[in-house]
């Protein structure tokens, strides 16, 4: 809630997602779409949920896209795809899966074995995001641009 509602203040300060978007747009620039799914995965790993990751980070992704002149809808979609990957390594999901198959106490092994598929997934998602935004010139469907 603090991250999401940080723009509601008496000092007219920008919200944390907007400030983070400005920093990322200035430092990473046009290659950011490659990393957008990884941000979603990090959010899901921390929050333990694709939905909560999207709630926390969609404003950040959308603003970053706007600052870079890219499709906000595509960037938020990349966020969601990455958050799905992050669910594979979310701790409570690893614990639940380990308990279900009788591997209690071996969560670390399960997590290590899940990391490689997660990384492949994120590399593919980042590459496809770059291809869609730059190679195919897909614009923002919400604004009917191309």
Residue ranges and their predicted role:
Residues 1-16, 46-47, 130-140:
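Transmembrane helix-loop junctions in multi-pass membrane proteins
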Residues 1-8, 26-60:
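Hydrophobic alpha-helical transmembrane segments of multi-pass integral membrane proteins
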Residues 10-22, 104-107:
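Flexible loop linkers connecting adjacent transmembrane helices
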Residues 14, 33-36, 40, 54-59, ...:
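Alpha-helical transmembrane segments of multi-pass membrane proteins, especially transporters
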Residues 18-26, 62-67, 109:
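Short amphipathic alpha-helical coupling elements at transmembrane boundaries
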Residues 29-44, 68-89:
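Alpha-helical transmembrane segments of multi-pass membrane proteins
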Residues 84-146:
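Juxtamembrane and boundary regions of transmembrane helices in multi-pass small-molecule transporters
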């Amino acid at each position: 809630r603090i991250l999401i509602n940080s723009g509601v203040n008496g000092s007219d300060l920008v919200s944390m997602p907007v400030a983070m978007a400005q920093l990322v747009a200035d430092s990473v620039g046009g290659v950011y779409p490659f990393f957008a799914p990884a941000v979603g995965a990090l959010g899901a790993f921390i929050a333990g949920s694709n939905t909560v990751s999207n709630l926390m980070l969609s404003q950040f992704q959308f603003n970053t896209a706007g600052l870079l002149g890219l499709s906000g809808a595509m960037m938020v979609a990349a966020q969601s795809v990455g958050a799905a990957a992050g669910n594979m390594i979310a701790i409570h999901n690893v614990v639940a899966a380990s308990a279900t198959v009788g591997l209690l106490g071996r969560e670390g092994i399960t997590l290590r074995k899940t990391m490689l598929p997660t990384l492949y997934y994120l590399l593919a998602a980042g590459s496809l995001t770059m291809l869609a935004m730059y190679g195919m010139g897909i614009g923002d469907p919400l604004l009917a641009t191309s």
